Amino acid sequence: MKRVLFRPQAARDLKRLPNRDQDQVEDAIERFAQTGFGDAKMLAGEGRQLRLRVGDWRVRFVYEKPDIIRILHIRNRREAYR
């Protein structure tokens, strides 16, 4: 299992989500950290950033080490790629 760390902005983003969406995003992050499975893909032109798709939400993250995931921010899909 990988350790998940949140940047301060990502923690604020998560707290601002509606409760139902917040639970879905937390579950998806935890599932990805445990299994490596989820709708995640590398972002072109963004260095080593990846995104995890959770409904209408996009979780951007990087692997800091093979066993550490750093969540950068959580945005609605309309705003995620601007």
Which residues are covered by each model-predicted region?
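Enriched for short, Lys/Arg-rich terminal
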Residues: 1-23, 37-38, 53-57, 62-82
